[in-house]
Amino acid sequence: MKQLQDEITQALTKLDGGSEFHEDSWERPEGGGGRSRVLRDGAIFEQAGVNFSEVWGSHLPPSILAQRPEAEGHGFYATGTSLVLHPRNPYVPTVHLNYRYFEAGPVWWFGGGADLTPYYPFAEDAAHFHQTLKLACDEHHPEYYPVFKRWCDEYFYLKHRDETRGVGGLFFDYQDGQGVLYRGPNPKGEAANYSNQVGEPASRDWEDLFSFIQGSGKAFLPAYVPIVERRHGMEYGDRQRNFQLYRRGRYVEFNLVYDRGTIFGLQTNGRTESILMSLPPLVRWEYGYQPEPNSPEAELYDTFLKPQDWSNWTANQ
């Protein structure tokens, strides 16, 4: 997890070229700590945060025990790396990544994923991101991507807005190598239905899953950096910037209302500055906003905030 943080921050520093990461090391009184790295006011990134944490304690919080009751009464160990990158140019999408590992008494599991949140509709960007993640998944199991992509669409969904947070990517949790792949809260959703059709894959051990996490983590830079390089030089005006700031509001809404990592961090007395590092530095809300018909903003709502089969997209569609 530390190595992933190192590799990503080094690459992002080089990519941005205008600022560097500032590191805060912190300790958690109940056990553990972490390193938070934040780049601010860069040439490309308005704010970029890449966190590593490793914490332990005497008992898991209610948000985890609700899903894994067999961990009740055991101490826990949790480690992970997470990032959120908020670019300055509205044509460059925001991106999020998180990979984590938990142990509690007799149980252990991996979780995580990566997802893309564009402000303007470029289908080739969404397709590149998905295709790169799918390749990393396919090296380990042919059903990882189809299940975890659907789970991502389900998880990064703002129920009160009836829209996805972006074009998705991968999301998974409670992966211990046993049972069906989907372990989420919606037994009647698309992810569960697909996972049930596939059935239980062959048992996978700790090393198999750790290798999958490593491969997915390494796929992040090739999935995202080419998109940044393609878009960050595009000219934009007040209209695009205002729309970006408005759409960033959805990011805030999701992270404060639904995000499991935020809730876990706050319930376990994590470092608040690190937990809320995912929030953008500038954001705006607007009462009753409606995009103009047939505009790029309307296309975002009509196509990009609904689940699509991005990995099979081709340029002539």
UniProtKB/Swiss-Prot annotation:
Pfam families the record matches: Coprogen_oxidas (PF01218)
EC number(s) stated in the UniProt entry for this protein: 1.3.3.3
Primary localisation category: cytoplasm
Functional pathway: Porphyrin-containing compound metabolism; protoporphyrin-IX biosynthesis; protoporphyrinogen-IX from coproporphyrinogen-III (O2 route): step 1/1
Reaction catalysis annotation: coproporphyrinogen III + O2 + 2 H(+) = protoporphyrinogen IX + 2 CO2 + 2 H2O
Presence of the UniProt keyword Cell division in the record: no
Binding site for substrate: 82, 98-100, 269-274
Taxonomy, superkingdom: Bacteria
Gene Ontology BP terms: chlorophyll biosynthetic process; protoporphyrinogen IX biosynthetic process
UniProt keyword list: Cytoplasm, Oxidoreductase, Porphyrin biosynthesis
Membrane-spanning residues: none
EC primary class: oxidoreductase
The protein's role, per its UniProt record: Key enzyme in heme biosynthesis. Catalyzes the oxidative decarboxylation of propionic acid side chains of rings A and B of coproporphyrinogen III.
Stored NCBIfam families: PRK05330.1
Quaternary structure, from the entry: Homodimer.
Family statement drawn from the similarity comment of this UniProt entry: Belongs to the aerobic coproporphyrinogen-III oxidase family.
Protein name: Coproporphyrinogen-III oxidase, aerobic 1
